[in-house]
UniProtKB/Swiss-Prot annotation:
It holds the Pfam family Questin_oxidase. Its EC number is 1.-.-.-. This is Questin oxidase. The lineage of its organism: Eukaryota, Fungi, Dikarya, Ascomycota, Pezizomycotina. GO terms for molecular function: oxidoreductase activity. It comes from the Eukaryota. InterPro entries: Questin_oxidase-like (IPR025337).
Amino acid sequence: MATASQIRLRPRLGVARATDTNPDGALEAANRLLQKNHNEHHMFWRSVAGHNHVAHSVLNTLALGGGPGDLQRAFDDGAEIQVPIPPMDRDAAASLSTPDQFRARMGSLEQYPNFLVFFTKEIETRGYPAVVIEYCFSGTSIAESMFANLFEGLYHPLIHLALGIEFDQPSIVAEGLAQAACHDSMNIEPFLFGTDKLAKTQDAPIDLNTPLLSLFHAVRDNEVLRAAAHRDHGDGVARVRDGILGRAREEISLIAARFRVDVDELDHRAAEMISCAAYLAGSAQRPGKARKIDFFHLHAVTASLGLIVLLQQPWVTPEQKARLIEWKARVDLVWYAASGAVELRRKDIVDYRPRHGLTWDSLYQAVRRVHDDGHLAKFIRALKAGEQISRPFEQGKRAEAFPIKGSMWLRIAQMAYDSSAGRPIEEKWIWGAGFEPNWATVPAV
């Protein structure tokens, strides 16, 4: 049985699995590699946007049916850039049980080993559902900040925490909580709380059925938002922090506040959210250029799988589930603006002709072997999960809110594989689809 410090995977875990069985030795290999990562590696290998993806890569490769060799490849592709986890400060870790000390140490990457020890002990004592409830969903000042921090850093705390829950690994849950606690800020928290307040105090009544897709179009149509982030800001973090939330927070908040979720519509709105995220990833292209997947829109899809995992937990209340969907969608809108709010063209998905013609099953087999740091495997698995949960809503009432339907899910997955497999990491993705210079090395079509 897994503990707060020991990895012990069981068969048949995972939301979107390629198979119920893995080759002999796969679970043992995954246990060993994940334990090594947990014991030896920091959660951050650099000070900005340097997230440790080793657990993501190993677990997603396992879920796609990977064997021991595939899992070792998944580990090795991410391990060489990792840095050792520093020694923890015993007094600092002990002090985190005091809310003032917890608050004072939040937002500092150097505090990761202390938060990891703290959450490990908490989970050992009470189990991870109780700890996640207290530190993310209880409504205290600390929990409210932790809830918002799940969406920091391109959703990485949410992705990591949800992987721990999905595969029932308390130690990975502890890693995810520690990551959320110490993550540096892009000002996501004030945006989310400000937008929440705005949604509840606007003079005009909010339509709980406002399609999320219409809000992406509203972002595209807003000249202030289209100009707020620019390539000179540097990386995606700066385009969010200094661009969209620094120069156009009021404009993005007014649009984002219009997305609301009724507790009776959780499944529908969650499916709508992941359909729109997949639409961003597949349709944010450049006319005249070969198809590529925007790195930031990719994360909107992979984080959706993490959200699905949380929505399946009976210990998360319907009200908190509605809030998770609202906040995830609102942050998706921010990242769309930060990538330049490129025109979204459905035909770029529908007209795409895959080079390899892979089915889902053959795609899983191919992705397991691709040298990658986990992004491709996460993306493919999240798309398959999206296809499954969206299918009941793609026809009939409000079907127009679901831009991705039927074979389009597989088409986007094929596009991702075709455009990234065998390429160095900097050439696998587009790092902001709305900025023309980023397409300079992409072949013309």
